[in-house]
């Protein structure tokens, strides 16, 4: 799989937030915090599930609490998507 870029993941976060009908989704940045967008825990789970599907990654349930905003979601997804494949 080709390396995934930060811009691609951030665009994916914005698109998935828009699918969830989150106001302000298009303006989400690396600095955006979920509380600024009034994202609740169910929406966060739906966002993470969508990112897992989109980028073919698995985000552990324990990591959900560490995802407090756009930057966290992008960095975690990026690191998982660009991990070397296990042989």
Region spans (language model):
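Phosphopantetheine-dependent thiolation modules in NRPS/PKS and related acyl-activating systems
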Residues: 2-39, 43-49, 54-87
């Amino acid at each position: 799989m080709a390396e995934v870029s930060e811009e691609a993941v951030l665009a994916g976060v914005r698109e998935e937030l828009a699918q969830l009908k989150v106001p302000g989704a298009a303006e989400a940045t690396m600095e955006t915090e979920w509380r600024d967008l009034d994202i609740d825990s169910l929406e966060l789970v739906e966002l993470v599930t969508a990112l897992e599907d989109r980028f073919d990654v698995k985000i552990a349930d324990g990591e959900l609490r560490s995802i407090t905003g756009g930057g966290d979601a992008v960095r975690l997804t990026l690191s998982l998507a660009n991990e070397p494949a296990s042989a």
